[in-house]
Amino acid sequence: MTGEELCRASGLSADELAQLERFGLVATGRSVGGMPYYDEDALLVASLAAGCMKFGVEPRHLRMYRTAAEREAGFFEQLVLPMLKQRNPESRQQALETIEELSRLGEGLRRAMLRSALRGYLE
């Protein structure tokens, strides 16, 4: 989708999208005729960022999520790289399943740790 379509679908302004791009939170998947195009991951990130912005969170504050995701991806890569080096469909499928499960577990851990860290405010 185009930047205009992404803004319309996510509720972002063009300036907000530009800020998200500047901080490396939303990336174009490809460029066609010099125009950037965005994929469904960009739409999801843009929509979630728009939701955060409604609470006064600025794009620069969201960089921590990008940094954490990059670190987590690097860690997962280390874990599944031996499977991917085997170069067979079964190992590739096992690597994908491992990443999916680790992602699910990591999401649960983050949620539990955040709840624990904020417990005094939530009770």
Which residues does each predicted region cover?
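Arg/Lys-rich, alpha-helical DNA-contact motif
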Residues: 1-8, 14-18, 22-123
